[in-house]
Amino acid sequence: MFRIGQGFDVHAFEEGRPLIIGGITIPHEKGLVGHSDADVLLHTVTDAALGAIGEGDIGRHFPDTDPAFKDADSAKLLEYIWKIVEDKGYILGNVDCTIMAQRPKMAPYIEQMQNRIAELLHAEPSQVNVKATTTERLGFTGREEGIAAMATILLMKK
């Protein structure tokens, strides 16, 4: 049996915060705003996994009104959800991710992101695809106000 899930997330830039995407800290003058560490890519993968197993979304499991998740490491949140995925008897088929950002350029960090996500999902890097695009200076990402990401995941019954 196969299950498919989709995730989407957006975070605005803010000075004085680190920029963490896909579990990798990227040098940039601004980071992303969020209750947790605001890792827009790991949030989309988490939401995609939750959607695939019919368990709602990241906000249901880790509400931004709960102080326990203030500045939480998104990798830890994904690990928690991935245990639920595995407990339900699923493994990763593949996950395909897209980051939408005008700046900074993501290309130098894509392989590291893929490796980190594969590690978190107990999978091979070949099962994880991360790509990045600009929005040709259109919209909030084009104006460099923030970053968006989306992911589609395929789970397979063990």
From Swiss-Prot:
Gene3D superfamilies: 2-C-methyl-D-erythritol 2,4-cyclodiphosphate synthase (3.30.1330.50). InterPro entries: MECDP_synthase, MECDP_synthase_CS, MECDP_synthase_sf. It catalyses: 4-CDP-2-C-methyl-D-erythritol 2-phosphate = 2-C-methyl-D-erythritol 2,4-cyclic diphosphate + CMP. Pathway: Isoprenoid biosynthesis; isopentenyl diphosphate biosynthesis via DXP pathway; isopentenyl diphosphate from 1-deoxy-D-xylulose 5-phosphate: step 4/6. One of its GO terms (molecular function) is metal ion binding. Pfam families: YgbB. 4-CDP-2-C-methyl-D-erythritol 2-phosphate binds at residues 9-11, 35-36, 57-59, 62-66, 101-107, 133-136, 140, 143. A divalent metal cation binds at residues 9, 11, 43. Binds 1 divalent metal cation per subunit. The keyword Metal-binding applies. Its EC number is 4.6.1.12. GO terms for biological process: isopentenyl diphosphate biosynthetic process, methylerythritol 4-phosphate pathway; terpenoid biosynthetic process. Keywords: Isoprene biosynthesis, Lyase, Metal-binding. Its cofactor is a divalent metal cation. The record marks 35, 134 as: Transition state stabilizer. PROSITE patterns: ISPF. Belongs to the IspF family. Homotrimer. PANTHER family: 2-C-METHYL-D-ERYTHRITOL 2,4-CYCLODIPHOSPHATE SYNTHASE, CHLOROPLASTIC (PTHR43181:SF1). Involved in the biosynthesis of isopentenyl diphosphate (IPP) and dimethylallyl diphosphate (DMAPP), two major building blocks of isoprenoid compounds. Catalyzes the conversion of 4-diphosphocytidyl-2-C-methyl-D-erythritol 2-phosphate (CDP-ME2P) to 2-C-methyl-D-erythritol 2,4-cyclodiphosphate (ME-CPP) with a corresponding release of cytidine 5-monophosphate (CMP). This is 2-C-methyl-D-erythritol 2,4-cyclodiphosphate synthase. It comes from Lysinibacillus sphaericus (strain C3-41). The lineage of its organism: Bacteria, Bacillati, Bacillota, Bacilli, Bacillales.
